[in-house]
Regions:
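Conserved AAA+ ATPase small/helical "lid" subdomain
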Residues: 202-254
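AAA+ P-loop NTPase catalytic core and its hallmark functional loops
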Residues: 1-211, 278-280
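Generic hydrophobic secondary-structure packing signal
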Residues: 31, 58-61, 228, 232, ...
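Residues that form generic nucleotide/phosphate-binding pockets
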Residues: 197, 201, 212, 216-219, ...
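C-terminal engagement/docking regions of AAA+ P-loop ATPases
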Residues: 19, 66, 248-280
């Protein structure tokens, strides 16, 4: 699909289609949707930040909130190498030497009135964030130097950034920090919620495996380890595969312990449940 802005034809990105849903922690969903609300014709939507450890569900929450609003969702993965043109418009040379201007997922969301997720936003440099400064205040536009155009955001456009709390990230400049508000912190889910998430992602898993993984995660959370439900899903999935390919009867616990070591490392075994169920 293409649109024309100030005489320049832009080729738009496709929305992301993911089969995921947000489970539990309804208050976090309420806070995100509230930040995006417009309560008066003079009001503006906010640009929230979702903060937390890797794997706690920040992107899942953002995507599910966008879909709950009935909007298309566009995800832009930020990296250390993300340039301003990657965020906005990229020129591509076609046959015959002609230039084709390709809109980023973020700019496509701006034009179409969708939801833009800047994933792991604090991996981007200040130069890249600076190109978004006018979008994040009451101006709500960006300027593409490459294409020589100004692009205004659709009234229905919404933006959210997810950010990990690890060391391999940049500090946000203050003028961006003040524009990405409110800050919504996502912590580890409660036991019942964690069980529900595992069951949603591993519907073919036996209850004993789900319970074992939940016990492991809850013990790790209590010790302030960084293991997340994403790690639990990987452990459970790998254990099921190991058990299904075994040439002899294999204890579930044996398969789970192998999976824990190979997904998280031997030090994670300190949080395993040592009672071994019968082989099956």
């Amino acid at each position: 699909m293409t649109v024309e802005i100030e005489g320049v034809t832009l080729h738009l990105a496709h929305p992301d289609e993911l089969s995921i849903q947000w489970v539990g922690q309804d208050e976090l969903m309420r806070q995100l949707l509230a930040a995006w609300m417009v309560v008066n014709e003079q009001d503006l939507p906010m640009n929230p930040r979702l903060l937390g450890k890797p794997g706690v569900g920040k992107t899942t929450l953002a995507y599910a909130a966008g879909r709950r609003m009935g909007r298309d969702v566009y995800i832009l993965q930020a990296t250390l190498d993300t340039r301003p043109e990657d965020l906005l418009v990229t020129p591509v040379i076609e046959g015959g030497g002609n230039l084709r201007y390709v809109a980023s997922p973020l700019v496509t969301a701006m034009i179409k009135g969708g939801i833009a997720i800047i994933d792991e936003g604090n991996r981007m440099s200040e130069k890249s964030w600076a190109s978004l400064a006018p979008l994040l205040d009451n101006r709500r536009y960006v300027e593409s130097i490459v294409a020589g155009i100004k692009i205004k955001a659709h009234p229905h456009f919404r933006l959210v950034a997810t950010m990990n709390d690890d060391a391999s990230t940049f500090e946000l400049p203050e003028y961006i920090h003040s524009r990405l508000q409110p800050q919504i912190f996502i912590d580890f889910p409660e036991r019942d919620e964690e069980h529900h998430i595992l069951k949603e992602n591993l519907p073919f898993a036996e209850e004993r495996i789900l319970s074992y993984v939940v016990d492991f995660l809850q013990m790790a959370h209590a010790a302030d380890e960084r293991y997340t439900v994403r790690d639990g899903i990987n452990v459970g999935r790998f254990a099921i595969k190991l058990k299904s390919l075994a040439t002899q009867r294999t204890h579930e616990t044996e398969a789970l312990e192998i999976a824990i070591v190979q997904v998280l490392g031997e030090e994670a075994l300190r949080y395993v449940r040592r009672n071994r169920p019968s082989a099956s």
